[in-house]
Structures are given as structure tokens and as C-alpha cells.
A protein has these predicted regions:
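Internal gly/pro-rich beta-alpha loop/helix module
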Residues: 7-28, 33-50
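Thiamine diphosphate
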Residues: 2-20, 50-219
Length: 219
């Protein structure tokens, strides 16, 4: 259930931090690997899961994450009758040549970063990846659309300079190889973390809106 760095102090473990890599490992045997970004997305994912045969893994985020809203403020991003989709367009800005791809729970940080970047004259779109596998051509289309680069963010281990890129970051890095610049925000040193709420833990690992802004500017 609760996965990533926001599992709570009594569940903090290597498995929790490596959940995305575990999902990728089992992906050939699964119907879907779900990574919902808020409680509403989790409801939509569970309903979709129940409607299909086959194996599934779902990483439920903490229920105190913000409920994601539409860009125009007209309401929540997902309703109870929403159809599950692999990728949701979250924020769009005119002239954007860069994009943030958020896997699951840190998606709201992408919106905060995009708003800050817009104020600095760097329009950046934001997409939420709700799970895997992605439809054929989805990543290649995004790479082609955003020639100035892509930034990924995920609440999980993304590797180190010594071990290479892992997780969702690795998936995007492979798709973008020699086609578009990429940068990644995630956990690179999982050895020590504070026994605090998940926002404090994310800040310790550098999973913040400020880190996303810096990553986009580095492209």
C-alpha cells in the first residue's frame, strides 16, 4: 500500500523506496502497475484494477496529499466516474518546449514548479503518469514534442552516478537518448532519512518544487 519515502516511520524500508523498480521488474507479468497521484486517482485505479483480469501492483499514496485540481480551478482533476488513463495532462502553458513528467504522488510539486517557471518566462507543461505500461509511442511522442527537454520526478530510488539511472527516470532516459535532454528528481542516496512526515522526508531527499525548477533550468 503506502510506498516511497512517505510510508511513515514504522514502515520505512528499502522495499518502500524501491517500489517503482520492483514494479518495473514484474511488469512483464502484470496487467498494469498503478501509481496514483492522490486519493481520487487511487479510487479510479482500484476501480480499473477490479474491472480487469491479470496481475496488478498499486502503490497507494498517503491520504494527506493534496487533491489535484484542474488548471482552471473548475474542480478536482479526477471524478469518481473518470476513466483510468496512463498519462494525464495536468498543466499546459503556451509556448512550452519543456515538460515535467511526474510519476504518482509528487505530481502536485510539478504544478508548483510550472507556476514558478511560468513567472520566470520558462513555460513548462506537466504530465502525470498514472501507471505503466504506457501506450505504444507515448514516451517517444513526448520526447519529440519537447525538444528543449524533459524532467522526471518520482518518490523512489532513481540510482546514482555509480550505478546508472533506474526507476521511471531510467525509462524516460532511455526513450530520450540522443533525442532530447533530460534531468531527474528522485532518491539517489537512500541510506539515511529523518523520522518525520513525508514532506520533510521528501525535502531531505531533494524531492521539492524548487528542485524541479532547478532541473528544468538545467536542461
Amino acid at each position: 500500500s503506502h510506498v516511497g519515502a512517505c510510508t511513515g516511520r514504522d514502515h520505512f524500508s528499502g522495499w518502500g523506496l524501491d517500489w517503482i523498480n520492483m514494479g518495473l521488474t514484474y511488469l512483464p507479468y502484470l496487467h498494469r502497475f498503478y501509481a496514483p497521484a492522490d486519493a481520487r486517482a487511487a479510487f479510479v485505479a482500484v476501480r480499473d484494477l477490479a474491472a480487469h483480469y491479470g496481475g496488478h501492483i498499486i502503490g497507494i499514496p498517503r491520504d494527506n496529499l493534496p487533491i489535484l485540481d484542474r488548471q482552471d480551478g473548475s474542480g478536482p482533476l479526477w471524478e469518481t466516474n473518470s476513466e483510468w488513463e496512463a498519462v494525464t495532462t495536468y498543466r499546459t502553458y503556451e509556448g512550452a518546449q519543456r515538460a515535467i513528467l511526474a510519476l504518482g504522488a509528487p505530481a502536485f510539486l510539478g504544478a508548483e514548479a510550472a507556476e514558478a517557471l511560468q513567472g520566470e518566462g520558462v513555460p513548462t507543461d506537466v504530465y502525470i503518469v498514472n501507471g505503466l505500461t504506457l501506450p505504444d509511442g507515448a514516451l517517444s511522442d513526448l520526447v519529440a514534442r519537447y525538444g528543449a527537454g524533459l524532467v522526471t520526478v518520482e518518490d523512489g530510488v532513481i540510482g546514482t552516478a555509480e550505478t546508472g539511472v533506474r526507476g521511471f527516470a531510467g525509462l524516460v532516459a532511455s526513450a530520450a537518448d540522443n533525442k532530447a535532454p533530460v534531468a531527474h528528481v528522485g532518491i539517489t542516496d537512500p541510506r539515511i532519512a529523518p523520522s518525520e512526515g513525508h514532506m520533510e522526508t521528501w525535502a531531505h531527499f531533494g524531492i521539492t518544487a524548487e528542485a524541479l525548477v532547478a532541473a528544468v533550468k538545467s536542461l
